Amino acid sequence: MKIILILCLSITLISQGHFDSLDLSLANVSDAEIKSLSETLYKLDSNRATASELLIDPQTLIPSSQTGSGNDLSPQPLFKVVSSTLLSKPTYEAFLDLLDNYKKMTGEVEDVPSHEEQEQDSFLQQTMNTNLGKELFNFLHSKGVYGSQSEFLQDLKMMWFGLYSRSDGVKLDSSGFEHIFVGEIKGGKVSGFHSWVQFYQCEKQGILNYYSHSFDGPWTTYPDVLGMQFNWDGYFKELGSAFIGCSPEFDLAIYSLCYITRPGKKCDVSLGGHSLGIQTYTWDKSSYGDGKKFIGSAYPITP
C-alpha cells in the first residue's frame, strides 16, 4: 500500500512539473562546482571592457540607510568613456538591437514581430559562439540538464524572452530579459534594470540621471559591481545593482547559471577570487513547456 501511495505521489508531482529529470540533474550541481564554473566564465569573458575602453566616475558614495532619499549627489554622468569599438563587437551589437524592443510601462502588451524574434535568436547564437557560452553549455550538458545545444538555446529563449503578465495576470507585458536588462516601470518606480550597457545608452540619450552609489565591489578591473541610485525618464530607482564592464554574454551566462542551478535562491559565485551572491527569482504565476518557470529577476546582491 505504501509503495502504491509513493508511486501515485510521484506521478502527481511529475504531472505538476515539480519533479522531473531536470530537478534530479541539478541535485548533482554542488556549490563548489558553481563557484568553480563562475571563475572559469569570468576568465573566459574576452569581450569584457578594458581600462582604456571604459572609464566611469562613481562620484558620491552614500550609506545604505540613505538609498531612498532620492537626492542627486553626483553632478556628472557615471560613464565618462565607452569605446565604440567595444560596443561594435558581435555580442554587444546583438544585445543593443534588443534594447528598443520593449515598452517600459507594465500593463502595456508587448508585441514580438518576426524581426524582433530574429534579434533574440541572434543574441543567443552570438553568445553560443563565444568560449564563455560554450563552457556554460558543456557544463550543463555534462550534468544531464540539456541533451543538445539546440535544446539549451530553445530553453534560454523561453526562459529569458517568453512573455508573461507582470500587471493584471492577462496582458503579456513582461519578460525576464526586459525586466533584468532593459528595465520597467511598475507602481511609479523603476523595476529591474541591471545592465550597464542599457544604463550607458540611457545616459547618452539624456533620459537617465545618475544620483549616487551605495556599493562598489572589490574588483580593480572589469567587471566590477556597483549598487546605484538613479532616475530613469522621471522614475526613481532606490538601488539598482549591476555588473559594470562585463560583456552581455557574461551577464546572460552568469545569471542563467544561477537561475538554472539555484532558481529563486541566493547563488554564491566567485569572480577573480572574490565572493559574490547573485539573487534570482522565478516567475511563479505562469509557466512554459513541462511546467518550467520563466526567470523573474536576477541581480548581484549588494549591501
Swiss-Prot record:
Glycosylated residues, chain numbering: N28
Primary localisation category:
secreted
Q: Which GO terms describe its cellular component?
A: extracellular region
Keyword Endoplasmic reticulum assigned to the entry: answer is: no
Q: What's the superkingdom here?
A: Eukaryota
EndoU domain segment(s): 30-303
Show which residues constitute the signal peptide: 1-19
Task: Kindly state which reaction or reactions the protein catalyses.
Answer: ribonucleotidyl-uridine-RNA = a 5'-end dephospho-uridine-RNA + a 3'-end 2',3'-cyclophospho-ribonucleotide-RNA
Where in or outside the cell it occurs: the entry states: Secreted
Could you list this entry's UniProt keywords, alphabetically sorted: Endonuclease, Glycoprotein, Hydrolase, Lyase, Manganese, Metal-binding, Nuclease, RNA-binding, Secreted, Signal
EC number(s) given by UniProt: 4.6.1.-
- Output one GO MF annotation: lyase activity
Q: What does this protein do?
A: Endoribonuclease that cleaves single-stranded RNAs at 5' of uridylates and releases a product with a 2',3'-cyclic phosphate at the 3'-end. The UU and GU sites are more efficiently cleaved than CU and AU sites.
- Subunit structure comment from the entry: Monomer.
Q: Which PANTHER family match?
A: PLACENTAL PROTEIN 11-RELATED, URIDYLATE-SPECIFIC ENDORIBONUCLEASE
Q: Tell me its family.
A: Belongs to the ENDOU family.
Q: What is this protein called?
A: Uridylate-specific endoribonuclease A
This protein's species is Danio rerio
Q: What is the lineage of its organism?
A: Eukaryota, Metazoa, Chordata, Craniata, Vertebrata
